[in-house]
Amino acid sequence: MVPREVPESSLTSLKTKDVARRRHKRRSRQHQRFMARKALLQEQESLSMVPGPGLCPLPSPTQTPAGTEASGNRKQRTKARSGSKGLCSKRPVPREAPSSGPSKYVAIDCEMVGTGPQGRVSELARCSVVSYSGDVLYDKYIRPEMPIVDYRTRWSGITRQHMHKAIPFQVAQKEILKLLKGKVVVGHALHNDFQALKYVHPGSQIRDTTYVPNLLSQPSSLTRARVSLKDLALNLLHKKIQVGHHGHSSVEDAMTAMELYQLVEVQWEQQVASTAKAHPEDRGPDSSTDVEQYMDDQYWPEDLAQSTRGDTREAQDRQEGEEGQGARSAPP
């Protein structure tokens, strides 16, 4: 007896039904896993809302510091629930402040132009601020308070055309300081940037990348006082920056500084924490007040750096002389 052939349409319908059945099973398994996960999360949430005897209640969402990302909050809650140290001590003890999250870190770099006699006075002409992850938070050209004498394009990358869309210094200063206040600021030779901004940042919240080689125990060639960001990037990050003859890019420099900081972030923050515990009253010198180191960068012409230091000393001597003359002329 010859078997009867099955119509092709029937085979197609069988295959279609088989595929649909497999998809349904796959979706059912996914749905089961989803429901099981949902039930587990709901159970954990209910346990955290009503702590048992001896268990520490988790902080409510309103207690979470502003600026923390939602994903970070979920991770922190999961760690808190799964941690082994869930018992509260009978006697309350002071707790250390939690380590700052990535949102508390920014990197900055500024480019200056020359104003005043022979262009020896450095004023801010561009400022860039990037986040911990390298996102550009701020990047604007800034019009100095005095007329520009020397654009220093070879180093600053600033040209006359950039000033057409520049904003006044006072406006830029307010915008930038709003980003910096309360943050840990990363940068290279930050005393230059803070000097240009006419701003003093707390020393405990400064991470100057000129200190990075010391934390990595690098050769003396990288630990000299005037080590450049370009050399650090090449030797530690294996990347080339500040190439060509069009000047620096403040965005690139700020990103590079943040990458250098992240190389030694753990060691650096441990050192900062241990120093704060050992000497809570000693916050260290503030780099923004170090006038003698202003313009101390190998990319600036040596005569320009020397003249700047000379002008600073002359201004200090002149101020001291005026104060002494005022004291002598004051009535008894």
Swiss-Prot record:
Per UniProt, the ranges with Basic and acidic residues bias are: 310-321
Motif Nucleolar localization signal extends across 21-29
Q: Which domain of life is it from?
A: Eukaryota
- Bias-annotated ranges (Basic residues): 20-36
Q: Where is this motif: Nuclear localization signal?
A: 160-183
- What residue stretches are annotated with the Exonuclease domain? 105-261
Q: Does the keyword Nucleus apply?
A: yes
- What is the annotated role of this protein in its UniProt record? Exonuclease with activity against single- and double-stranded DNA and RNA. Mediates p53-induced apoptosis. When induced by p53 following DNA damage, digests double-stranded DNA to form single-stranded DNA and amplifies DNA damage signals, leading to enhancement of apoptosis.
Q: What is this protein called?
A: Apoptosis-enhancing nuclease
